[in-house]
């Protein structure tokens, strides 16, 4: 520190061993025990430990993920541990970072449609939306992602602490597909009351569609996005999705 005193790298933090896919410990994560920041820190990166290439608990979740054809991606280590203890075995988490291209492609090795369920606070919802947009360029036929959006200011661990396991199972059985998640989350941020707003949002959708590299996937996403948009303009879009956030202060 400033006084040339040595201090443990994980001082006053709860330590989580992080294993590679073979089950060998290659690093550690540390979570604060109070409200200070950063909430999580990890071991320095090395040839054996690259955060963006790994998913916490994948070594224990992979067999269940293949069997159940689903992989649940949560936000934090405690969420993974709580769900695993409650017999939801195919659960992993990014290593305290944003969900990455490498983690998406890694999850696709075990299921064609992994599920993201981040926390229900504003930060978690922003992270979910950011993950959704990140996935678009890499979509190909039969490879996608889906979302479970938790109610305000909840996380999987708090659900289980409050004995709401059955409520959580209902949410997990009714995920939102990627296209719907992006459309309803983004369109809920604007009013679409005048022509300029409508033109701006239409252009926003066009820009999103252009990021999809696979042409067949791009074609069908464009068709579905435009269909949802025109239904919303006509006021005939009666579809509702439970717990999709109505407003996020910033999606950037």
Tell me what each language-model feature is.
Residues 20-21, 62-70, 98-114, 120-252:
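A charged alpha-helical hairpin associated with nucleic-acid processing machineries
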């Amino acid at each position: 520190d400033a006084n040339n005193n040595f201090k443990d790298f994980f001082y006053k933090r709860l330590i989580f061993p992080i294993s590679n896919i073979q089950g060998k410990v290659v690093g550690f994560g540390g979570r604060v025990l109070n409200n200070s920041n950063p909430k999580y820190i990890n071991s320095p990166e090395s040839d054996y430990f690259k955060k963006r290439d790994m998913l916490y608990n994948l070594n224990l979740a992979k067999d269940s993920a293949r069997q159940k054809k689903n992989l649940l991606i949560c936000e934090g280590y405690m969420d993974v541990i709580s769900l695993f203890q409650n017999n939801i075995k195919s659960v992993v988490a990014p290593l305290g970072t944003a969900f990455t291209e490498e983690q998406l492609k890694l999850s696709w090795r075990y299921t064609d449609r992994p599920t993201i369920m981040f926390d229900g606070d504003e930060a978690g919802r922003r992270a979910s939306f950011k993950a959704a947009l990140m996935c678009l360029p890499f979509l190909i036929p039969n490879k996608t992602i889906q979302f479970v959006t938790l109610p305000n200011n909840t996380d999987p661990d708090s659900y289980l602490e409050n004995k709401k396991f059955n409520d959580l199972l209902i949410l997990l059985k009714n995920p939102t597909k990627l296209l719907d998640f992006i459309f309803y989350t983004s369109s809920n941020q604007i009013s679409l009351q005048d022509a300029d707003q409508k033109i701006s949002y239409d252009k926003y959708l066009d820009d999103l569609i252009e990021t999809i590299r696979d042409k067949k996937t791009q074609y069908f996403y464009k068709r579905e996005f435009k269909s949802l948009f025109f239904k919303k303009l006509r006021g005939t879009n009666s579809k509702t999705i439970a717990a999709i956030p109505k407003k996020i202060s910033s999606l950037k």
